[in-house]
Regions:
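Generic C-terminus detector
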Residues: 95-100, 399-401, 405-439
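Active-site loop ensemble at the mouth of alpha/beta enzyme cores that anchors a bound cofactor
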Residues: 329, 352-360
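Glycine-rich phosphate/pyrophosphate-binding beta-alpha loops
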Residues: 266, 270, 339-355, 420
């Protein structure tokens, strides 16, 4: 056996008697069934529970696993699906030993360690997206129940409500924060963390994301990099497993106000679509496509000044791009749009900046200027769903550490993390590895 044995004792899958030994390694549980060796990958396991004798079934140990299973007749995407394993363990002490051995191994702790359950504060925004966040959480609640953790649930009903709740959390009472909502709710939660006197500690509280909004760009990014398909149950699975990574935030300065962004800034066509399509929110993500087609028929341009400090590793590929490292570069022109991203995915179906990473210390910026035809623009919008648009001739791509945008057109919309902000000069500067997420 390749892996070191962590624990070994009698164990049998029900209804067989516990005559053979089960073997636990750091990542696999082995047992015998009808003389054939069976195994369970602990990477799929979320928790265990002890079961007393009932209705003639002997006492034992129940293990909850969520392996990937292909679902759907057409897409056949892989989704986490519950599978339960009931093992016969008549001895009370042995049952508890098996449970502790498995639970401790799941969190990479010694068998004799006294492990306290992780404590999660779950925030649900029932007004996000199609207003189904509460129902979405109920679909995945059982996964939290089956895991070795404790949680409390609070519904919020406005941006201020979310900020105030997070601002007043007692950090010593929780180990993580879970958001069931859209990107706007995540923005509000981060604002609440950063408004605290102890923000330097608070912002390190790991964030778990369950998609309940329209776009869900951060959640899609986390699922994609973890090789999980886009589904609430898969997002909940990542949270329960508890793996963490750092991710960048950006400080935003505008009109003597300072706050933080985790996702994006858009201006021009993109922000017009994002905000103008709000009245079609009931259509979900389809609203963006329909409204974009409407605006393409009467395409606007926006005069402005885009200044930026390039990332040291950035190598320009566009013929219009000339870079002097370490200095502010300035582009003043008529723009169709500017789209700055901290994540690869702006929404679950829009891979806008496929080279972006959550903790690369930079933002990826896409620019299209006046002179781009409607056909070329439509092509860019259609291809960005799969991230196949960066080689288009009129699309400029930049990787930056900081940037300033000064709109020089009177009327327009600026959007940060999916929410409109003042239409005035704005500056964003990346702060590497400031926050943490479950991934």
């Amino acid at each position: 056996m390749e892996n070191h044995i962590v624990y070994q004792h009698k164990l049998a899958i029900y209804p067989e008697p516990a005559q053979e030994s089960g073997i636990l390694t750091k990542d696999t549980l082995f047992w015998q069934h009808n003389g054939v060796k069976q195994q369970l990958n602990l990477n799929d396991v979320v928790g265990t529970s002890l079961v007393e004798q009932e209705d003639g079934i002997p006492p034992g140990l129940l293990i909850y696993a969520y392996p990937k299973v292909k679902v759907g007749l057409i897409t056949k995407k892989q989704q986490r699906v519950l599978q339960q394993y009931y093992f016969t363990v008549p001895d009370v002490k042995l049952r508890s030993q098996w449970q502790q051995a498995i639970n401790n191994t799941l969190v990479n702790q010694p068998l004799d360690a006294d492990i306290k359950p992780r404590r999660l504060q779950i925030i649900i925004n029932p007004t996000s997206g199609k207003k189904k966040a509460s129902q979405i959480f109920e679909q995945v609640r059982s996964l939290f129940e089956q895991s070795n953790l404790e949680y409390s649930v609070t519904e919020t009903h406005s941006a201020a409500d979310t900020k105030n709740l997070v601002h007043n959390l007692i950090l010593s009472d929780i180990d993580g924060l879970v958001i069931v909502g859209g990107d706007g709710t995540i923005h509000d939660a981060i604002a609440g963390l950063m408004s605290r006197p102890d923000y330097e500690t608070a912002i390190k509280l790991p964030l778990g994301i369950i998609p309940g909004g329209t776009g869900n760009g951060l959640c899609k990014t986390l699922l994609e990099q973890s090789q999980e398909s886009y589904a609430p149950i898969n997002a909940a699975f990542l949270i329960v497993k508890g793996k963490q990574q750092s991710f960048d935030l950006a400080t935003v300065k505008q009109n003597n106000r300072e706050y933080h962004s985790f996702l994006s800034l858009s201006w021009g066509l993109i922000s017009d679509v994002d905000i103008g399509s709000e009245k079609l929110k009931f259509l979900g993500a389809l609203r963006f496509d329909l409204y974009a087609l409407l605006l393409l028929s009467a395409l606007r341009t926006y005069k402005g000044k885009f200044s930026f400090i390039p990332d040291p590793d950035f190598k320009p590929t566009h013929h219009r791009t000339t870079i002097q490292q370490g200095e502010w570069q300035v582009i003043e022109d008529d723009f169709i749009f500017l789209w700055a991203m901290n994540t690869p995915w702006a929404a679950h179906d829009m891979n806008v900046t496929p080279h972006a990473q959550l903790n690369d210390g930079a933002m990826d910026v896409l620019v299209m200027r006046k002179g781009t035809s409607r056909l070329e623009l439509l092509q860019a919008l259609l291809r960005c769903g799969k991230g196949q648009h960066l080689d288009l001739p009129h699309l400029e791509y930049y990787k930056v550490r900081a940037f300033r945008l000064e709109p020089l057109t009177d009327k327009g919309i600026l959007v940060v993390d999916g929410e409109p902000v003042d239409y005035s000069a704005i500056e964003m500067r990346v702060i590497p590895d400031l926050a943490y997420v479950n991934c």
